[in-house]
Amino acid sequence: MDRNSVTGLALIALIMIVWLQFMSPDKKPVIRESAKKAASVEQVNVPLKPAPVSASDAFGAFASAANGKARKMVVENDLFRATISSKGATLTSLVLKKHLDGALQPVQLVSNRADGALSLLFLTREGRKIDTRDLYFTGGSVDTLHTVTGKESYSVRYRLNVSKNRNILITYSFTGDSYRVGYDVQLNGFSSALAGNEYQLQWDGGLGYTEKNREDEAHNALAGAYLGGSLVKLDAAKDNQAYREEQSGEAKWVAVRNKYFVAALIPAGPTGGFYLDGSKKAGNEFENYLASLKMEVPVSGASLDNSFSLYMGPLDYDIVRAQKAELEKIMDFGWDWLTRPFAEYIILPVFSWMNKFIHNYGLIIIIFAFLIKLVTYPLSLASTKSMKKMAALQPMLKELQDKYKDNPAKLQSELGRIYKEAGVNPLGGCLPVVLQMPLLFAMFYVFRSSIELRQHGFLWAHDLSVPDSILNLGFTIPMYGDHIALMPILMAGTVFVQQKITPTAQTNDQMKIMLYMFPAMMLLFFNNMPSGLGLYYLMFNVFSVAQQFYINSTTTEADMPNVSIAAPARQKKKKSGGGK
């Protein structure tokens, strides 16, 4: 490995330092922060008057529905158990049956930060802010539990009577084998009753946290919307600050998410835009989010029907993409132009295909590392031969550097000639590493945020989506963390071995530094990374070491360059002449 190769590796290491520090959970960036407050939605989301003293003052025409008794019913399908309350016709609980939280209890998606997750929000002509969670609906089911399975379907309807000709109907539709729930809203007699001629359908309270590492989960929690082909994210990154984002137009969906789960509102028709809100209290990792769709109410017409779908479930790429609403855009796979294509079109499809036959993700990662090593073998072979040639050329290059130390232009010219005659590229040794960087970064995003690896163990690693900690230190070492993970130690050892057996130039101070510095940096980088990523890089290096032994044993003297330090003499042209 020559000076240029060392420089290239150092630059790659610098890129990793900057990138990994940027991605560190404890330095969480604000994804999108806006304090703009458009008047149309500001009226809906901010109280307009002091707290009233009576139901009539507070709710006006809705006062008759402000008192009642909440009745709850449970709808259970193959995937979740949903609880609906007649107060607000809202979801008060949604428990996923196939996923466990950090305490090994079924995941609860509805947080306790709000009195129910779903509601309609609107402003009356008299200036009263109405949230349907404050009102009591009739209807529902006389049964307290209804079970639906397979392809079976079940619907339940709630009704809110305001006056003789004015009412609200809300209908939930469940399917036995789906995370998707139909949600239909019918407004009768409201064409001239609402200020701004709009209402909002909102999910309030964010999502309940499910992981042991609350700080890491907060790093991934956010509210989002998809409008005009662009993803808008709102992240309540700082304590005691108001975060708001509002846009007009046709939103395809709004959603709130934590690290591995999402709740999304997907309209069947056009919308008037969206509104996102977020906050975080000091001393508490939980980030509270609200996401709402703005729906227009025509000034004419006796009734309005709007249909929506609710997706409440895991951030499983195949399931989320099957919603056909581009909801997969809320999954963070890094840069759209670089790492996301690797994640969506290589890593996830290959993992999904292999999982049909192999149900151990540790083995899948090992096989995937072998396949990548196999695909990159031609590059590795060319790189190794290039480095071996560079090593053979080092005495000649040193002689040239001494000979032309006072003539840089001549030195560069001679170096170029030597490289050309030998058929080597000074940076050829870095090429395989550079080409694998996008894949490595994409795997970081996949392993960090995809639910496929969550709570799947391998050997001593109990969960491939988190570090494989074998010892908690009780204190934090800067850039390293508060624990010792075994996978990064083994991986750093393979990096050291690989460098030792890789052809290099004559031993110099640069190479001695890189021999120890690069494994040390990798140890620091990977200690807080998902153990699945460490397993991939560990096995990739093991295969690289085996490959290097093979290449070293099959390279012959015939592969070495045969060049001279002296430039080839130019042949003199013969003079044309007559006879002898």
Curated annotation (Swiss-Prot):
Interacts with the Sec translocase complex via SecD. Specifically interacts with transmembrane segments of nascent integral membrane proteins during membrane integration. Its main location: membrane. It comes from the Bacteria. GO terms for cellular component: plasma membrane. Keywords: Cell inner membrane, Cell membrane, Chaperone, Membrane, Protein transport, Transmembrane, Transmembrane helix, Transport. NCBIfam families: yidC_nterm, yidC_oxa1_cterm. Required for the insertion and/or proper folding and/or complex formation of integral membrane proteins into the membrane. Involved in integration of membrane proteins that insert both dependently and independently of the Sec translocase complex, as well as at least some lipoproteins. Aids folding of multispanning membrane proteins. InterPro entries: Membr_insert_YidC, Membr_insert_YidC_N, YidC/ALB3/OXA1/COX18, YidC/Oxa/ALB_C, YidC_ALB_C, YidC_periplasmic_sf. PANTHER family: CYTOCHROME C OXIDASE ASSEMBLY PROTEIN COX18, MITOCHONDRIAL (PTHR12428:SF65), OXA1 (PTHR12428). The gene is yidC. Belongs to the OXA1/ALB3/YidC family. Type 1 subfamily. GO terms for biological process: protein insertion into membrane; protein transport. This is Membrane protein insertase YidC. GO terms for molecular function: membrane insertase activity. It comes from Chlorobium phaeovibrioides (strain DSM 265 / 1930) (Prosthecochloris vibrioformis (strain DSM 265)). It holds the Pfam family YidC_periplas. It is found in: Cell inner membrane. The lineage of its organism: Bacteria, Pseudomonadati, Chlorobiota, Chlorobiia, Chlorobiales. The chain crosses the membrane at residues 5-25, 259-279, 362-382, 427-447, 477-497, 513-533. It is a multi-pass membrane protein.
